[in-house]
Design a protein with these regions (language model features):
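Conserved acetyl-CoA-binding loop-helix of GNAT-fold acetyltransferases
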Residues: 81-94, 112-116
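A short beta-loop-alpha structural element at the N-terminal edge
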Residues: 1-15
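Conserved GNAT-fold acetyl-CoA-binding loop/helix
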Residues: 14-41
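A short, internal acetyl-CoA/4′-phosphopantetheine-binding micro-motif in the GNAT/acyltransferase core
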Residues: 69-80, 103-104
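Conserved acetyl-CoA-binding loop of GNAT-fold acetyltransferases
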Residues: 115-124
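Conserved beta-hairpin
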Residues: 48-61
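Conserved GNAT acetyl-CoA-binding A-motif
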Residues: 94-106
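Short glycine/proline-centered loop/turn elements that form peptide/ligand docking sites
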Residues: 85, 89, 106-110, 127-133
Length: 142
């Protein structure tokens, strides 16, 4: 079930972000993700509209929107491949006719996921936190 996040969800949201980041971004030193947790809270989550996917009381994933910027979409690693990410992205697309996000170039599964859902690569930028290249991806409803 999709629902808007509540303040009491925040610790579990950060846990999902950390676990999924460590798995999906293994090309980045793990200490980077551990150190970035507070920045995640203050830079994105405190300023974003967040939806969570919940099943039987457990949060399986979340997505965060800041205007038309998809700041985060993360699913617990042990729950990936079951439609959770698809449902979260559908929610974002239902709220914004146009979406922008950034995806690490090395994160090929995520690049494929977004391209399958209609996103196009618009350019590359260097991530200030890690120094790794990210694709700027864009979605426009037709």
């Amino acid at each position: 079930m999709l629902r808007a996040s509540q303040p009491e969800d925040m610790e579990e949201i950060v846990e999902i972000w950390l676990l999924a980041s460590l798995q999906a971004h293994d090309f980045v030193d793990a200490s980077c993700w551990w150190q970035a947790q507070e920045e995640l809270r203050t830079r994105y989550l405190d300023h974003a509209r967040i939806w969570v996917f919940e099943e039987r009381g457990d949060l399986l994933g979340f997505m965060a929107l800041v205007d038309d910027y998809l700041a985060a979409l993360f699913v617990r690693p042990d729950r990936q491949g079951r439609g959770v990410g698809h449902a979260l992205l559908q929610e974002a697309r239902s709220r914004c006719a146009e979406l922008h996000t950034r995806v690490f170039v090395e994160n090929e599964p995520a690049v494929r996921f977004y391209r399958r859902h209609g996103f196009e690569i618009g350019g590359e930028v260097s991530d200030p936190l890690t120094g790794h290249l990210q694709y700027q991806m864009h979605y426009q409803a037709v």
